[in-house]
Amino acid sequence: MCDRIGCTHFPKLSEMDFSGATASSRRGFLKRAAATGTIAFGMGGGLFGGAAHAGAPVKSTHGTGFCNLNIFLAHSRQYAAKDGTELVFINTPTFAEQVTFLGMGQVDVGLMPYTSFMALYDAGAPVKIVAGGGVEGCAIVARPGIDSAEKLKGKTLGTFQLDTLEVMPYDYLKKNGISFKDVKVRYMANTPEAVEAFKAGALDWICTIEPYASALVNDVKGATMLTNGVDLYGKGYTDCVLAARSSLIKDNPAGLKSIIKAMMQAQYDAETQTEAVLKELVGKYYKTSLENAKIAQGKQPAVVDARSQTDFILQRVDSVMEMGYIKKKPGRDAIDWTLLEEVIKENPDLYGKLKFKSA
């Protein structure tokens, strides 16, 4: 889909080995990853590595927005350790590897946009959605003077390929009678790069996530938020989900349940100790100011129990199909809430205290 300026192409999922066989050899994986345009980058605490904790490891990739807050806090505080599981982050240089690492078996779970998951699933990767990440919080922000969809024609959009942040501009333009072909698209490598490009004037409009959307409106004088997605998708729309490899679900359900429980505890802490949580995560996991994080707080809440969003997730893939990323709609078997429901049943007190949930 690139005419497209400085395009970071998403790897061809159809050419990848999803068996997990590459996971046993780091060196072998790196050779294969280089051939498909993926490169490994770091491991451990925060976004830049750190000390490990006791317990059997569950390896995970992650994104950068507030929809990742529950897994960030679960990692920072290693809540799953008391249940014998260590949450280990495998960090990546670009958005593409956040997705492909899960498909190729380099990680066990990933917090990712549901659109990216659907592409993996469509390509045959043995993965399932097992829990929610966050809701709402995606936004389109335009530079000063661009205050309507009509003014976006011919302008340069900064986004990420095969992401909800690409699908939202597509849907926004379509709603306003404008073709995606009528704009220029620049696929970015990561959120910090996209944010800085917008600030520097290299992008006319950007689709990004909280806390960065609110930060741009706050930091770039005259910038306009054209939509926060609610007018397109309705209140409480899903952005990111927790996806897991089928092998983890089968071979280590207890470990996966401990991660889901840890994310649930993190959600409760974020809802009840908001300022303390932001102080802990800003800088270490979020590259923005505490002031901007406070402004954005609440615009993309963490929601582990995403069962009420099942139909939304399955129906929103229409746009992904129109864009040519998947060949057929996924069935209901792409989503497995079984372990989430077991965690809810086994932890009624914790679940009962959560502000955001399906029940």
Residue ranges and their predicted role:
Residues 1-28, 39-43, 51:
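N-terminal secretory signal peptides
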Residues 31-35:
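Sec-dependent signal peptide recognition
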Residues 48-54:
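Sec/Tat signal peptide C-region and signal peptidase I cleavage site
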Residues 54-190, 194-197, 204-210, 225-227, ...:
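Short, glycine-/small- and polar/acidic-enriched structural segments
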Residues 78, 82, 230-235, 301-310:
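Short, solvent-exposed loop/beta-turn-alpha elements that line the ligand-binding surface or hinge
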Residues 115-116, 192-284:
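Pocket-lining segment of extracytoplasmic ligand-binding domains
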Residues 250-329:
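Secondary-structure end/capping motifs
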Residues 321-359:
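Conserved C-terminal helix/tail region of periplasmic/extracytoplasmic solute-binding proteins
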